[in-house]
């Protein structure tokens, strides 16, 4: 899990989903899990 300022490039990857949990924005990617990130 990485913490990134901008998730725009990650959400364009194939298989990416943008999820809000507890007021934070996450990108989860089941096809390619190394693209998991939280916006910070």
Curated annotation (Swiss-Prot):
Keywords: Ribonucleoprotein, Ribosomal protein. GO terms for cellular component: ribonucleoprotein complex; ribosome. GO terms for molecular function: structural constituent of ribosome. InterPro entries: Ribosomal_bL36 (IPR000473), Ribosomal_bL36_sp (IPR035977), Ribosomal_L36_bact (IPR047621). GO terms for biological process: translation. The keyword Ribosomal protein applies. Disulfide bonds: none annotated. Belongs to the bacterial ribosomal protein bL36 family. This is Large ribosomal subunit protein bL36. It comes from Corynebacterium urealyticum (strain ATCC 43042 / DSM 7109). The lineage of its organism: Bacteria, Bacillati, Actinomycetota, Actinomycetes, Mycobacteriales. The gene is rpmJ.
């Amino acid at each position: 899990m990485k913490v990134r300022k901008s998730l725009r490039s990650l959400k364009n990857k194939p298989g990416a989903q943008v999820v809000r949990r507890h007021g934070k924005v996450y990108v989860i990617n089941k096809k390619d899990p190394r693209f998991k990130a939280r916006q910070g």
